[in-house]
Amino acid sequence: MELNNLKPAEGAKHAKRRVGRGIGSGLGKTAGRGHKGQKSRSGGFHKVGFEGGQMPLQRRLPKRGFTSLTKEFVGEVRLSDLEKLPVDEIDLLALKQAGLVGELIKSAKIIATGELKRKVVVKGLGATKGARAAIEAAGGSFAE
C-alpha cells in the first residue's frame, strides 16, 4: 500500500447532483424546483425571520435595556491589586501608572475581592461597602 494508490471504498463517494442538464438525468428542465412561484426563481427566498406577513417575533417583543455609553470609561480595581501597589497614597493616576486601569478610564471603583493587609490612603476613588470596610479595618482611610 502506497499513498499514491489510496482510494476511497467503493460506494463511499457520491457524484455531485448536476441539475438542469437534460431530461434523462431526472433533474432536467425545472431542476427539482417544481413550476413557477418564488421558490423556483433565482434569488427567490424570504428574508430571515419573515413570517409570511405576520408581525415577526423580534418586533412583537418589547425592547429592553440599553447600552451604557460611560461603561468603557469606568474601571474596577480589586483589593488584592491595591496590596501589590508600591505606593501608600492611591488615586486614579497611581492606578494608571501601575497599569491596573486603562489610559481612557475617567473614574474607578474599588471592589472587595481579595484582601488588604496594609494601610493605604484612597483619594478620589469610589469603593463598595465591603471594600470600604476592609480598607478601614486595615488602618486605611478615604480622602475626597
UniProtKB/Swiss-Prot annotation:
Entry's Gene Ontology cellular component terms: cytosolic large ribosomal subunit
Protein origin, superkingdom: Bacteria
Key words, A-Z: Ribonucleoprotein, Ribosomal protein, RNA-binding, rRNA-binding
Coiled-coil region list: none
Stretches with biased composition (Gly residues): 21-31
Classification via Gene3D superfamilies: 3.100.10.10
GO molecular function term, any single one: rRNA binding
InterPro entries with a match to the protein in the record: Ribosomal_uL15, Ribosomal_uL15/eL18, Ribosomal_uL15/eL18_sf, Ribosomal_uL15_bac-type, Ribosomal_uL15_CS
GO biological process terms, semicolon-separated: translation
Region of interest (Disordered), residue spans: 1-57
Family: Belongs to the universal ribosomal protein uL15 family.
Subunit field text: Part of the 50S ribosomal subunit.
Function: Binds to the 23S rRNA.
Protein name from the UniProt record: Large ribosomal subunit protein uL15
Name of the coding gene: rplO
